[in-house]
Amino acid sequence: MGKRLHLFVLLFVGFAVQAQIFPGNPKRVLFIGNSITYAGRYVQIIEAYQRAKFPSQEIDIYNVGLPSETVSGLSEDGHASGRFPRPDLHERLARVLEQIKPDLVFATYGMNDGIYLPLDETRFQKFKDGILWMHEQVHASGAKIIHITPSLYEEKPNENIGYGKVLDEYSHWLTQQKNWQVIDTHSALQKYLNAELKKNANFRISKDGVHPGDEGHWMMAKEILRYLGAKKINRMNSVEEMLEPFKDPKAYFDLIVQRHNMLKDSWLTKIGHKRPEMKMGLPMQEANLKAEQWMKQIKEFTR
């Protein structure tokens, strides 16, 4: 056994009897959410881990995150400079579930659902109602669902909306739901932010206060993988370190990203949505052919 392959085996020791990182051995795993999920880096990291650790496992991972979307159905006046209201998950969820037919769904909403206003019980109830509806719809389709708490809102200097507190409340409510699987990335990001602020008072996870950068997506992926049982992930500080046993971890991850992004846009286009100004994806037949070609290259890394 080559030195790198030997290291690869040792890196993931303890999971030999597990067929994949996802519970219940699903064949079709769906990630749904807003622009943070559409950006997709945290999903891509999870996919890279799954495919690196279990190269023989045939599993499809879908990302149909949609920028601006809410599960509350709310939209602020003048959203997107008045060009369009926020899309509502209620409009497309049935099509998503029907066309993808997932076995397992990861869902993360909340960032847009309070429409960037102070905490208000009416808006909060709309969020709760939307989450409960989504939970029921996913279960009715025969799939399992794992909720992910919203990421952080970092207020700008001299801003005093208190929207960070809104997301604290939304996240806390989610974690208190009985018999639900909930991954608390919100608290993990807050802990990380607090630690970094002690070193650098100007540190930010997101430049605009909403959309995490690569480091934020890495922390989200780490918390999700840790929840799913990847205990060794806590010791790792980057995607490259996670994939270090490969000869060229960057090339491997780049292939995952290219394939993921192409399929993401194709599925969004095929399923349909009410969000203007989105990239048109390739027709699914063409996208699937390209995806197969990329998958062959990805699998070469684990032979």
Protein language model annotation of sequence segments:
Residues 3-10:
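Sec-dependent signal peptide recognition
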Residues 14-16:
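N-terminal signal peptide c-region/cleavage motif recognized by signal peptidases
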Residues 18-68, 72-75, 83, 93-101, ...:
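Serine-esterase "nucleophile elbow" of acetyl-processing enzymes
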Residues 25, 200-303:
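Conserved catalytic region of serine esterases and O-acyltransferases that act on ester linkages
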Residues 31-32, 43-44, 73-76, 83-125, ...:
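Oxyanion-hole/transition-state-stabilizing segment in secreted/luminal serine hydrolases
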Residues 35-38, 66-72, 104, 111-116, ...:
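Solvent-exposed loop/turn segments at secondary-structure junctions
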Residues 139-144:
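A short helix->loop->beta-strand "cap" motif at the edges of active sites that frequently abuts
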Residues 155-187:
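Substrate-gating cap/lid alpha-helix
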